[in-house]
Amino acid sequence: MAAKDVKFGNDARVKMLRGVNVLADAVKVTLGPKGRNVVLDKSFGAPTITKDGVSVAREIELEDKFENMGAQMVKEVASKANDAAGDGTTTATVLAQSIITEGLKAVAAGMNPMDLKRGIDKAVIAAVEELKKLSVPCSDSKAIAQVGTISANSDETVGKLIAEAMEKVGKEGVITVEEGTGLQDELDVVEGMQFDRGYLSPYFINKPETGSIELESPFILLADKKISNIREMLPVLEAVAKAGKPLLIIAEDVEGEALATLVVNTMRGIVKVAAVKAPGFGDRRKAMLQDIATLTGGTVISEEIGLELEKTTLEDLGTAKRIVINKDTTIIIDGNGEEPAIQGRVSQIRQQIEEATSDYDREKLQERVAKLAGGVAVIKVGAATEVEMKEKKARVEDALHATRAAVEEGVVAGGGVALIRAASKLSELRGVNEDQNVGIKVALRAMESPLRQIVLNCGEEPSVVANTVKAGEGNYGYNAATEEYGDMIAMGILDPTKVTRSALQYAASVAGLMITTECMVTDLPKGDAPDLGGAGGMGGMGGMGGMM
């Protein structure tokens, strides 16, 4: 086992604080509408330019191992805030730095670290309750656009785009962000259910100009099995032909004789058919077939539950207003499923989301909810260069997370005002002893730091602005973009309550751990390889000159 370097007490805390300050100072220059950019060097390709706090934090690794431990713990604050609310990473870092700096001063002055931590925790719990009281619901498009604009670093087009996407697919819909091909941002909305499976044969195509298949008011046969024998399908094909409607077959696979017969019948105009593979694999495929069945009012024909293809009737088939299939995707528009059944299915999947342990499973389940309940919107980000594209895409993703958080828990006045109002309500809060009271003061003072940093980044005097804002009431604050005072919510400067709450909670959590640190242990750096000097016994080699 390698030898360790151990530091105690003040020595450890000073080193740790130095690391905290390096990371926090790099991150906090990005805060607010007039925050600066940070350029990140990459081992290959062009450097990345960003104003995203968590992107900056992730890049920082310090040479001194004790300082690095401090930096990594604050990096954890930014990452946790990002995971929980998708934004607020810079705010969380600024809060953490302030609590740690003030807290360690108190420890150096002889306060009990555990009581300080208890005081900080007490203040944060009370502040979170105050934030909830200050919160107002965020339901209309205008408020959603404002939240998106603030989170995308005051880019109005992004805010409007997100609001439009949410309006079209609903709050349950899936909104994804992709790199576009042009200079302009675009919004593509897919209404209905779309899945990534295209036609099994190009001979089914009935719209050659677009290379797609369009079926109006079709029947939909859902089979959880491979279909290779046409005989078992004859009864249902005859019934569909009599009804004079097209048929879409969604099965594990359609192959061989069955596929050939369907193609021939389609080309002769006897019955209009198209076939696609069912989406997903294994259990996920079964679940998605059941989703499609619920959406279209059909039944999944599965031998596991005793249903056979030969005995399938028109009552077992689903229906929809229209279906569009191309070589990669199938879209079912306006399925004729019953609304209570669809809502029941959505509730069932939501329950699974609550219980899901992996992010991947959760994401797939959320996609299924969106396909049943709303739709899918794709924001295609446009930019002139790849460097700008990456930076803009990261901003749009942040803004999207922030707007979701706003819809979930409401909004509070932005620009650091909500934290100042929450802190002012807690001036009478007391702990059980003097050390806890100091902890409470540390937390309340830290809650001013985001506003102070925003003001500092726009070149004004933080103390003057902070005192003016504290003298005001309600949503009265400082708009750093226009350098004016006024009602923050009326000016459209909003922060999602969830973002502000998460930033404060995670900052206090990690800061509390660091204040109560008394010892730090790290590996000693490995020494250089020992110097072997002149290798013994080789001296006689000198006489080999005559070999030439």
Curated annotation (Swiss-Prot):
The keyword Endoplasmic reticulum does not apply. It is an enzyme of class 5 (isomerase). It is found in: Cytoplasm. One of its GO terms (cellular component) is cytoplasm. One of its GO terms (biological process) is protein refolding. Signal peptide: none annotated. ATP binds at residues 30-33, 51, 87-91, 415, 479-481, 495. This is Chaperonin GroEL.
